Amino acid sequence: VCVLAHHFGKEFTPQVQAAYQKVVAGVANALAHKYH
């Protein structure tokens, strides 16, 4: 997340961070579900 914030600068708003976290959580959930 810190790398993304540094890369995007002012474009990396709390809304963008929330969307990114939602995607990461979805991917992690899908992977966890796949392996169980």
UniProtKB/Swiss-Prot annotation:
Domain annotation Globin: ranges: 1-36
Record keyword Endoplasmic reticulum present: no
Entry comment describing in which tissues the protein is expressed: Red blood cells.
Residues with N6-acetyllysine modification: K34
Organism domain of life: Eukaryota
Keywords carried by this UniProt record: Acetylation, Heme, Iron, Metal-binding, Oxygen transport, Transport
InterPro entries reported in the protein's UniProt record: Globin, Globin-like_sf, Globin/Proto
GO molecular function: heme binding; metal ion binding; oxygen binding; oxygen carrier activity
Coiled-coil annotated spans: none
Membrane-spanning segments: none
Family: Belongs to the globin family.
Function: Involved in oxygen transport from the lung to the various peripheral tissues.
Subunit structure and binding partners: Heterotetramer of two alpha chains and two beta chains.
The name this protein goes by in its record: Hemoglobin subunit beta
Annotated gene: HBB
